């Protein structure tokens, strides 16, 4: 499903048959314009999605921006203008803002953590813990904020987690079967919870070791054991407060589901609507 189809689905969810409030008080074909205002500091992401909401309602709608995705914006700043049929402006307002606020919130939170990794080898990754039918938008927002995308979907790579390992009969057996099934160029990543599992994964030839909810001391030992043999990824309970400590340990990647499932929105609004 492409972006336009997802946006149209969101519009149908909100408008259904008609915007009865707007249609009851606004005449047809009355032109107007409204300002896009920031209500808090943050990083903007999703401007083209915001614009597309109005264009899909009426292709004649004009949307002007005074910033671009990835820019830092300030509270009270006017960052855009929407001009067109007032009915369209009112009916599309909520859907357009929902996208822009959600995407900008993810970009803002990602930027806060990514900035803590500047100057280090460690890369910040997202996960598949995304909102249904929002993955394309949420993962884009992570990239805008300075993070990197892990797997976009289940076809993108092999990641053996606890349930895969249990069903396969153990770490070594899971890696062996994955290697037999996967093309040679595909890396095999496996999640481990302790050093014994880690040693089995290395013996089996895993390419990336995900250290899941391990203690700091065990992670230090794990990184040493993996040096020159496999890349390391830290996952689980990643916060702004503990990122520096994880970087010091020397992991190659830090993955965080919180980038997409727990980022607060960036407060934005459409204000000063008037007829023209």
Where are these regions (language model features)?
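Acidic/glycine-rich phosphate/pyrophosphate-binding loops and surrounding catalytic core
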Residues: 1-204, 208, 220-225, 230-234, ...
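Short secondary-structure boundary segments
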Residues: 213, 236, 257-258
């Amino acid at each position: 499903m492409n972006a336009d189809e997802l946006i149209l689905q969101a519009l149908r969810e909100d408008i259904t048959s008609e915007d009865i409030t707007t249609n009851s008080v606004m005449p047809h074909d009355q032109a107007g314009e409204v300002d896009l205002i920031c209500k808090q500091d943050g990083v903007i992401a999703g401007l083209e999605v915001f614009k597309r909401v109005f264009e899909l309602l009426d292709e004649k709608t004009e949307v002007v921006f005074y910033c671009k995705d990835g820019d830092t914006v300030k509270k009270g700043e006017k960052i855009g203008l929407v001009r067109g049929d007032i009915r369209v402006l009112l009916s599309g307002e909520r859907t357009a803002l929902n996208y822009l606020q959600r995407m900008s919130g993810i970009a803002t939170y990602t930027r806060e953590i990514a900035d803590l990794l500047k100057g280090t080898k460690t890369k910040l990754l997202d996960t598949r813990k995304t909102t249904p039918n929002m993955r394309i938008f949420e993962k884009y927002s992570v990239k805008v904020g300075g993070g990197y995308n892990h797997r976009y979907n289940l076809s993108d790579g092999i990641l053996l987690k606890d349930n895969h390992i249990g069903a396969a009969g153990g770490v070594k057996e899971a890696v062996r079967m994955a290697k037999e099934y996967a093309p040679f160029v595909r890396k095999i990543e496996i999640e481990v919870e302790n050093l014994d599992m880690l040693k089995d994964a290395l013996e089996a030839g895993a390419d990336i070791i995900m250290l899941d909810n391990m203690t700091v001391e065990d992670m230090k030992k794990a990184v040493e054991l993996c040096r020159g043999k496999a890349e390391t990824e830290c996952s689980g309970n990643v916060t702004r407060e503990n990122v520096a400590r994880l970087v010091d340990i020397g992991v190659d990647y830090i993955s965080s589901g919180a980038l997409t499932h727990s980022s607060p929105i960036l407060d934005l609004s459409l204000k000063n609507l008037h007829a023209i």
